[in-house]
Amino acid sequence: MAFEFRLPDIGEGIHEGEIVKWFVKAGDTIEEDDVLAEVQNDKSVVEIPSPVSGTVEEVMVEEGTVAVVGDVIVKIDAPDAEDMQFKGHDDDSSSKEEPAKEEAPAEQAPVATQTEEVDENRTVKAMPSVRKYAREKGVNIKAVSGSGKNGRITKEDVDAYLNGGAPTASNESAASATSEEVAETPAAPAAVSLEGDFPETTEKIPAMRRAIAKAMVNSKHTAPHVTLMDEIDVQALWDHRKKFKEIAAEQGTKLTFLPYVVKALVSALKKYPALNTSFNEEAGEIVHKHYWNIGIAADTDRGLLVPVVKHADRKSIFQISDEINELAVKARDGKLTADEMKGATCTISNIGSAGGQWFTPVINHPEVAILGIGRIAQKPIVKDGEIVAAPVLALSLSFDHRQIDGATGQNAMNHIKRLLNNPELLLMEG
């Protein structure tokens, strides 16, 4: 009887995934842990390894098709895999009748402690990235009990093993549920007739676009947005960057205006901490965050990604510049990990890089504010009673009106303007 390999749970809260690429076909001989396919959900592509050795009998799900966790995606002739059979029909019936049991922590096997005897003959179900992670942490993966579906070991299980306890539930959003590399396979347009006066083609909505759409709709439906628009003379900022641009280049740093904006935003979040919170209406709680992680919205060929500069308050402008540039390269190359897109407390969206000016950026929920920066343009301003030309930066600040009042939002905007108008004040921030 063929081993029916079902789509495993590829992350917390993830119930389906799009098969973006198969690495095997019928008749191929495979070994345990060989990569079978790439499966995408939200913004992450996960490599799915084979839990058994054998010969591929039949690929059940075509590329570009969305499969639900538990669906049979490939059949493998693996005579020695009977003990590893997922008990497919039993699993299906139990999951349909009692779906809540699938994720109940009480049903999971306890995590082994480092003092317990290890069965070296035990078959381990874990992705290659998890095995590598365990090796890097000096953990014998055979000693770790898996909390994933069908006993699959996750990175959280490895961390829990190191801590000597059970895995803790993640409080991150489902959009950042895995720590695999980010990638995207563009959806191919469907072959249709282009005859007639109004030719059309259709394509399946890519998984990343679905995730972006879901996040945008959720944010707009959940948070009442208010957007303030302003502008500021940044001649001093322009001169400051010009002065230190060559010094930065000598250290291998490409200095842009964005790190200055990051530091100014962090200062505003500290002065007006309501902007650095989350508003949990269901729980009746406001979450105050005592760390300052700044998301940087990045436009890529695969869609909008938001890598995060963590602990931006502890980093210099040069360090922030280096990190932003590194994250931008990873975003363009599809190499961002989900961990690099987790944990933002406030986000910056730079429409100025596309030549834009003012706009109404959508809050990256569950954050409560987002700062939009437009282009720097030469404009006439009044200085010392005279009209002169100066570089002027457009700013747009959207905030969740449930948590932030208009005056608070404008005061935060004024603080950001003050710092960008005189960047030497950023040195006073420590």
Curated annotation (Swiss-Prot):
This is Dihydrolipoyllysine-residue acetyltransferase component of pyruvate dehydrogenase complex. Belongs to the 2-oxoacid dehydrogenase family. The lineage of its organism: Bacteria, Bacillati, Bacillota, Bacilli, Bacillales. Binds 1 lipoyl cofactor covalently. Signal peptide: none annotated. It catalyses: N(6)-[(R)-dihydrolipoyl]-L-lysyl-[protein] + acetyl-CoA = N(6)-[(R)-S(8)-acetyldihydrolipoyl]-L-lysyl-[protein] + CoA. Pfam families: 2-oxoacid_dh, Biotin_lipoyl, E3_binding. Its EC number is 2.3.1.12. Residues 2-77 form the Lipoyl-binding domain. Keywords: Acyltransferase, Lipoyl, Transferase. One of its GO terms (molecular function) is dihydrolipoyllysine-residue acetyltransferase activity.
